[in-house]
Amino acid sequence: MKTYTAKPETVQRDWFVVDAAGQTLGRLATEIARRLRGKHKPEYTPHVDTGDYIVVINAEQVRVTGAKTTDKMYYHHSGFPGGIKSINFEKLIAKAPERVIETAVKGMLPKNPLGRDMYRKLKVYKGASHPHTAQQPQELKI
């Protein structure tokens, strides 16, 4: 008996919608990353993108535990000398709530071209509406 390896052209991808309201950031992000990679499927193959599309709604209502609302910092660099910028969770969730979930999930995906392809299948939106109703996403309880 041979080991099954998935082919990119035969992978069946589904669309799922996840409601982030009241969810803990890390627990939500790990399950999303797992599904983007396709590790929940029996035909998972490490070198093939077997994951599903994930649409996250209500990104502004995601929660963190402890004092992370004020203590958790997000960093980026402008590219100029001394151009390190930082913003805490509380300010970032008010400014760009999508980036909080995107950053958490991106850190859990592989840092290579395959991981970037997986990351492109993540769609995060503030509020309860999203433009992917034509794909008929199934609701995913996490």
UniProtKB/Swiss-Prot annotation:
The gene is rplM. HAMAP family: Ribosomal_uL13. Part of the 50S ribosomal subunit. The keyword Ribonucleoprotein applies. GO terms for cellular component: cytosolic large ribosomal subunit; ribosome. Keywords: Ribonucleoprotein, Ribosomal protein. This is Large ribosomal subunit protein uL13. GO terms for biological process: negative regulation of translation; translation. It comes from the Bacteria. NCBIfam families: rplM_bact. Pfam families: Ribosomal_L13 (PF00572). GO terms for molecular function: mRNA binding; structural constituent of ribosome. The keyword rRNA-binding does not apply.
